């Protein structure tokens, strides 16, 4: 393959994730994006039980029952001249670690905001994570077919709460039952909305020019006058779009629309392929790797069990950073130092897998894994280096796991260790007893673990409260002092799934006191994989 062909393949890749608060419409927007990418023919809307058309990207049993996306799916589709990789992140209240780690594998994010509610808690948290890497953000103000807050007010809220400048690209005309469409500030065109066309791609009527009398006829004189008035204000008070500020993560272009009505999604996609960066360079512990390099490198950011219920398999999701993946390629797994031949990597359309012959930087490929691959693993063509910045977060919630049948202790431990390698939950084994404590960043994770232990490992377990409120990974360069610390705090020490030592504190007060007492011991809130 010639260098120019390789460069062309790299330059057309766009890899992004969607971040939002639960119920802001993330799964619906994912569906509509796939519809525009011709990846699906009609969009199934996410509803509670009873509706048979399940959304394409929600595929684990529990997700189908609850109408929420629990695991991160990966979908690739063509749009315009680009190939887009969309990483779907769980939108539900408390899915987190998976989501945080997924954000380390993308070059850009789409923030979906419910325009009736504005900035919500979950969005704030996710934005903090994107800030760690200054990821560029596009914004979609959703649900304009309902009654929303004043758009100017919502933009102000985004700017003040998320500390990012907003540059409106389109502007809404009316909302709720009076929603008529949007005006594009940079193309000087109005796109008119028709109701009831949400499941397919609709032909949109376009009115050129803001002073066109046709506009008054189409949306009514009152709304047309209101639009012109609002635009005067918008042009005076808001930021203009600047590509450099967007790429630095300082400014977000804002699009208005309704994902359910399939309106405005294509404007956002046009912005994404035009402005979002092609695959970006990444740091390793020795140097920076750019997408232009011909030698293959990649890192694993997620492990998912049982995408295929018929086989008890696990799939490791790897982001390609540089080079071209080819079938039966020999790669070095840096952590173990072993060379492995990867003959059957997968590409995804949530849950439907197909084997791939090649992949380029920005693409996500799936590797079959029988427990040998861990989150954070780096694969290269022989170079010894490790990609950095794939964090493990200290859990905020803890439960003790107990068996209904005490004879199944071995299966329980195996199940929990596998689930912890996958990042579904973190496991802590106290040094002084045989308890198994699981830590999570959100309550729903405990239900998921119990459900999966039952379906995948045939283990009936229940969880109960435990006197732990937080955990920190501990280390100390002074061996003697560390031994003393371990001896005196044995009751509060545990090993995690990767056998790293952690201090599990009953209260924050206890943690702070212990910290003061042992200044030479470092207490880490995150741990690199």
UniProtKB/Swiss-Prot annotation:
**What PROSITE patterns would the database entry show?**
G_TR_1 (PS00301), G_TR_2 (PS51722)
InterPro entries named in the record: EF-G-like_DII (IPR053905), EFG_III/V (IPR035647), G_TR_CS (IPR031157), P-loop_NTPase (IPR027417), PrfC (IPR004548), RF3_C (IPR032090), RF3_dom_3_sf (IPR038467), RF3_GTP-bd (IPR041732)
Keyword check for Iron-sulfur:
no
Cellular component per GO?
cytosol
Q: Which residues are recorded as binding GTP?
A: 20-27, 88-92, 142-145
Biological-process GO terms, alphabetical: regulation of translational termination
Q: Which residues form the tr-type G domain?
A: 11-280
Citing just one GO molecular function, the answer is: GTP binding
Instruction: Note the HAMAP family from the entry.
Output: Rel_fac_3
PANTHER family for this protein: PEPTIDE CHAIN RELEASE FACTOR RF3
**This protein is called what?**
Peptide chain release factor 3
State the organism of origin. Pectobacterium carotovorum subsp. carotovorum (strain PC1)
